[in-house]
Amino acid sequence: MADRLTQLQDAVNSLADQFCNAIGVLQQCGPPASFSNIQTAINKDQPANPTEEYAQLFAALIARTAKDIDVLIDSLPSEESTAALQAASLYKLEEENHEAATCLEDVVYRGDMLLEKIQSALADIAQSQLKTRSGSHSQSLPDS
């Protein structure tokens, strides 16, 4: 997961891409401009141009990305936070970190204990299999 500034930069880059794509598609699909001194014959019976659909699509994409940018900006730390507030926040984070470390150490210890039990059980199983195999081999050998 990226930090907030990286997310914000990615969102701004995405918004710039959307603007460029919107301009390019609208330029490509847009109707020709009419000039007063040039006569052009345009067929009025042409099928509807998909420009309107593209305009709505890009408007929705741009609006959604702009909202995402607003949310990311609002989530950034404010300039109003004082050193005391930052220190308190850091202290709280350190406490949570120590609690998580203690919990992790406990889980690792219990995991090690379970691993030892499993290894001991596997060793017992292997020994008993070896004993049964060696016992069956000695019984199958003829006595001379």
From Swiss-Prot:
Q: What does the entry list under GO cellular component?
A: mediator complex
Domain of life, per UniProt, equals Eukaryota
Disulfide linkage? none
Q: What are the protein's UniProt keywords?
A: Activator, Nucleus, Transcription, Transcription regulation
- The leader peptide range reads none
Extract the InterPro entries matched here. Answer: Med7/Med21-like, Mediator_Med21
State the Gene Ontology BP annotations: regulation of transcription by RNA polymerase II
A molecular function (GO) term: transcription coregulator activity
User: PANTHER family annotated for this entry?
Assistant: MEDIATOR OF RNA POLYMERASE II TRANSCRIPTION SUBUNIT 21, RNA POLYMERASE II HOLOENZYME COMPONENT SRB7
Q: What does this protein do?
A: Component of the Mediator complex, a coactivator involved in the regulated transcription of nearly all RNA polymerase II-dependent genes. Mediator functions as a bridge to convey information from gene-specific regulatory proteins to the basal RNA polymerase II transcription machinery. Mediator is recruited to promoters by direct interactions with regulatory proteins and serves as a scaffold for the assembly of a functional preinitiation complex with RNA polymerase II and the general transcription factors.
Q: How does it assemble?
A: Component of the Mediator complex, which is composed of MED1, MED4, MED6, MED7, MED8, MED9, MED10, MED11, MED12, MED13, MED13L, MED14, MED15, MED16, MED17, MED18, MED19, MED20, MED21, MED22, MED23, MED24, MED25, MED26, MED27, MED29, MED30, MED31, CCNC, CDK8 and CDC2L6/CDK11. The MED12, MED13, CCNC and CDK8 subunits form a distinct module termed the CDK8 module. Mediator containing the CDK8 module is less active than Mediator lacking this module in supporting transcriptional activation.
Its family? Belongs to the Mediator complex subunit 21 family.
Q: What name has this protein been given in UniProt? A: Mediator of RNA polymerase II transcription subunit 21
Q: Which organism is it from?
A: Macaca fascicularis (Crab-eating macaque)
Q: Which gene encodes it?
A: MED21
